[in-house]
């Protein structure tokens, strides 16, 4: 069985930066943007052991976790570590990640990868998250848990 998550990248036409605190909290914000037909992908293949093996195809990197240990941020695929913690994943699996655009492209890649990850994990766990709940969770994980700067549009 393969569980998949996919999320579209986005382009901002104007207003970028007005969605970043504290500006948006004090002044409000408005952005004109759209998703595009480029995506971040996540595939999860359950395993029968206690290992989580993550393959980042874009970074040509593999990271392993043991579900019996705490998932610790170590600078290697911390987006995945944060998603595992947020979704409380405690079953073995292989995770495959790929994105149609490179990090730093200005298309919201890290947030898009996070949404693809969380979508696949939620499907695997049988957790229903509507678009707003998914956006809130992805924002919390990236901005609050990982302390990654960015706005709401990401």
Task: Specify the residue positions occupied by each region the protein language model found.
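Active-site signature of alpha/beta-hydrolase-fold catalytic machinery across serine-
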Residues: 116
């Amino acid at each position: 069985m393969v569980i998949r998550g996919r999320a579209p990248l986005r382009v901002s036409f104007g207003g970028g930066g007005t969605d970043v605190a504290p500006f948006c909290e004090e002044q409000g914000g408005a952005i004109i943007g759209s998703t595009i037909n480029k995506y971040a992908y996540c595939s999860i293949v359950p395993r029968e052991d206690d290992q989580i093996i993550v393959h980042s195809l874009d970074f040509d990197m593999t990271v392993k976790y043991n579900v019996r240990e705490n998932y610790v941020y170590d600078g290697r695929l911390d987006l995945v570590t944060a998603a595992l913690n947020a979704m409380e994943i405690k079953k073995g699996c292989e995770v495959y990640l790929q994105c149609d655009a490179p990090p730093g492209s200005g298309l919201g890649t890290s947030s898009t990868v996070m949404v693809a990850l969380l979508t696949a994990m939620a499907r695997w766990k049988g957790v229903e998250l509507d678009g707003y709940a998914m956006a809130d969770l992805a924002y919390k994980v990236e901005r609050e848990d990982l302390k990654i700067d960015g706005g709401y549009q990401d």
